[in-house]
Amino acid sequence: AIENSDNSSVVSFQPVSFPGRDQFIDEKKKKKQRYTLTHMVHDVKNQLGVTEPMRDWFPLSGMGPFSDLTDLLIDHNAKFGAVNCGCHPSCGVGTILFVNKKTKQMVPLLEFLDLEQFAKDVTVITDGNLPKPIAMAQTAIALIRNFRPERAPNGYDLLTLFRQFLSQTGARGNKVGEFESDATEFDWRVLFVAGMWFQDLFTYDFRRTEMCIIPYG
């Protein structure tokens, strides 16, 4: 995905779980073969040398405020809105990497953007439900507030981040998906890395099942 960052935008890991009744699996085998999201997060750090496990990873549902912002910024009469991942906080985790198409250098987004505070700011913006020009200005101010230029990749400025944010969230134009790809526009491409949590008897959570966003027959 890194070598082909101009064509790849998402990598999703599927952890190992033991379906059904697992009373016949001894503790030694379970400990050896179970691979959880925690293992994945630390392996990305240990094997790729990027991301900080406690800083750069967040629940997939944490992207909800940005879906709401996209819906606010596009035409209210649009046939389709943004995809909103309203799953349980324990459903999965994700992180955002910026990959340079030429050098293949990787930088976590949260290295130079306070995403937690930015999400809170975006929630205030969407709750205000003001006209698009005002919401756009508020979003720009929120990015200015949370951008850390001294930690950003060389040559990557606030204006580029703002343009790329609108593009990646589908918020430019009058409808989601109006612009199919921005692969040729930016030197740094967004690579979203995520992992799903498949439950087993060892960690089953009924509330998480109730909030699952993947339909099962």
Question: Could you describe each region identified by the protein language model?
Answer:
Residues 1-67, 88-92:
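Conserved C-terminal portion of the radical SAM core fold
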Residues 63-78:
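Charged, glycine/proline-rich intrinsically disordered loops and linkers
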Residues 75-217:
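Radical SAM enzyme core and accessory elements
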